[in-house]
Amino acid sequence: MLNRRNGYEYEDLLACARGEMFGPGNAQLPLPPMLMFDRITDINDNGGEFGKGLVRAELDVKPDLWFFGCHFKNDPVMPGCLGLDALWQMVGFYLGWSGGEGRGRALGLNELKFSGQVLPEARKVVYNVDIKRVMRAKLVLGIADGWLSVDDQIIYRAKDLKVGLFKQGTSLG
């Protein structure tokens, strides 16, 4: 299990995806190709818009990323749902990083707006989540607002991203 740090490299993220970071049965990132960022550049529990925590991550855009080959033929664009999933991944990572126990599941969001797209010629995607609230009861629930920028232009905004950590035997419903 890694010590709590304020940044993580790709190999660290892969260790998290293998279940080696937060302990057995606890939060994991997905393995590639569904792991949607290359590094976490900042994570803390007192920053962000609401002063309750922040996670910032980056994806280096390359024309050979897997989704460009299939979405869409002769019109490659990163699927919007993958950027949204990255934001949920980051909230789940934050919950594990902050000591929450259980397996992570995305539970929804209240609002999502797209105002641009990620194309193969882009250089870098930056993801940001600002933690609004963490509740620790039967399950651990994180609520955050987030955004995605491509080459320094914000193109997605998400409000009230919800992720829960569920211990074995706890139902989603």
UniProtKB/Swiss-Prot annotation:
Q: Where in the cell is it found?
A: Cytoplasm
What keywords sit in the KW lines?
Cytoplasm, Fatty acid biosynthesis, Fatty acid metabolism, Isomerase, Lipid biosynthesis, Lipid metabolism, Lyase
Any Pfam family hit: FabA
Give a yes or no for keyword Isomerase in this entry: yes
Keyword Isomerase attached:
yes
Q: Which GO terms describe its molecular function?
A: (3R)-hydroxyacyl-[acyl-carrier-protein] dehydratase activity; trans-2-decenoyl-acyl-carrier-protein isomerase activity
Spell out the catalytic residues. H71
Any one cellular-component term (Gene Ontology)? cytoplasm
The alphabetized list of GO BP terms reads: unsaturated fatty acid biosynthetic process
- Which pathway does the database say it acts in? Lipid metabolism; fatty acid biosynthesis
Superkingdom of the organism of origin? Bacteria
**InterPro entries xref list:** FabA, FabA_FabZ, HotDog_dom_sf
- Catalytic reaction annotation: a (3R)-hydroxyacyl-[ACP] = a (2E)-enoyl-[ACP] + H2O; (3R)-hydroxydecanoyl-[ACP] = (2E)-decenoyl-[ACP] + H2O; (2E)-decenoyl-[ACP] = (3Z)-decenoyl-[ACP]
Write down the EC number: 4.2.1.59, 5.3.3.14
Similarity section: Belongs to the thioester dehydratase family. FabA subfamily.
Task of the protein: Necessary for the introduction of cis unsaturation into fatty acids. Catalyzes the dehydration of (3R)-3-hydroxydecanoyl-ACP to E-(2)-decenoyl-ACP and then its isomerization to Z-(3)-decenoyl-ACP. Can catalyze the dehydratase reaction for beta-hydroxyacyl-ACPs with saturated chain lengths up to 16:0, being most active on intermediate chain length.
Q: How does it assemble?
A: Homodimer.
Family matches, as NCBIfam families: fabA (TIGR01749), PRK05174.1 (NF003509)
**Protein's name according to its UniProt entry:** 3-hydroxydecanoyl-[acyl-carrier-protein] dehydratase
